[in-house]
């Protein structure tokens, strides 16, 4: 398993805390800038990254800081894709926004883990097929594993 530098993690937490203190808490989500939204939702990214780090999905191929970094890339991309009309029309804006962002963050972390796992790079569409239909499609799984083992011969 890859280890992370504790000093860097402590510095990251301190910087995040200082940036969070500087935010104006009286604004609605729509009134914040992109950078401010990133700062607000960085704890969500860290939460999701920690779940990946402790589960089998990351399986020791990336450190927690790498997972947080991939999650932040997904957070920035998700913030740029927010449709504020949909968020404003919902009953619970915070819940809607967090569920939208968490889906994008999880996808970015999953993609980062897939790219850094192992020596054989598998195309993303094949990984998605395997992930979705692992129980239902035995032929896909057999083809996937047979192609790996035949390439080792």
Specify the residue positions occupied by each region the protein language model found.
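Alpha-helical promoter-recognition and RNA polymerase-docking modules of transcription initiation factors
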Residues: 1-122
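Charged, low-cysteine interdomain linkers and short loop/connector segments
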Residues: 114, 121-153
């Amino acid at each position: 398993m890859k280890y992370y530098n504790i000093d860097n993690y402590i510095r990251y937490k301190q910087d995040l805390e200082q940036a969070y203190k500087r935010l104006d808490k009286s604004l609605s989500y729509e009134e914040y800038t992109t950078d401010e939204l990133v700062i607000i939702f960085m704890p969500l990214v860290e939460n999701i990254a920690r779940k990946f780090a402790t589960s089998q999905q990351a399986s020791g191929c990336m450190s927690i800081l790498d997972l947080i970094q991939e999650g932040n890339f997904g957070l920035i991309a998700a913030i740029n894709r927010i449709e504020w009309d949909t968020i404003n029309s919902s009953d619970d804006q915070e819940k809607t926004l967090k569920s939208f962002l968490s889906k994008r963050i999880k996808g970015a972390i999953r993609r980062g883990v897939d790219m850094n796992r192992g020596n054989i790079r598998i195309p993303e569409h094949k990984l998605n097929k395997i992930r979705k239909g692992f129980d239902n499609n035995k032929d896909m799984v057999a083809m996937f594993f047979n192609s790996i083992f035949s390439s080792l011969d």
